[in-house]
Design a protein with these regions (language model features):
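Ribosome large-subunit tunnel/peptidyl-transferase-proximal elements
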Residues: 2-121
């Protein structure tokens, strides 16, 4: 399977899941994007189309901490950071959107860290 076909298949999976998952103000959607080198996460209110909180492995707060770490540890730090930012905005519950990626590896590490930091999903 070529890279293009894999990307298209992931987008098809994501669209299929997005038909069922919608974020609201009370329970926004936590969307994950995983690239080859980095991981990004946003907490989104789909009713207004606004991003309430975001974090990534290239975030300024994590700049010194992620250097030299493996990708799994980076994902854990990003999960903790986004959970802390969401909690400061008063968000306690989210709907997890894995973005068409398998729930394993870095995606699972990010989700577990966010749960441990206090987000409920």
């Amino acid at each position: 399977m070529t890279k293009n076909n894999r990307t298209e298949a992931r987008i098809r999976r994501h669209n299929r899941v997005r038909k069922l998952i919608h974020g609201s103000e009370a329970r926004p959607r936590m969307s994950v994007f995983r690239s080859l080198a980095e991981i990004y996460v946003q907490v989104i209110n789909d009713e207004t189309g606004t991003t309430l909180a975001a974090a990534s492995s290239i975030d300024h707060e994590l700049q010194g901490k992620v250097k030299g770490l493996k990708k799994m540890e980076q994902a854990r730090l990003v999960g903790e950071l986004v959970a802390n930012r969401a909690k400061t905005k008063g968000i306690k519950q989210v709907v997890f959107d894995r973005g068409g990626f398998r729930y394993g590896g870095r995606v699972k590490a990010l989700a577990d860290a966010a749960r441990e930091a206090g987000l409920d999903f």
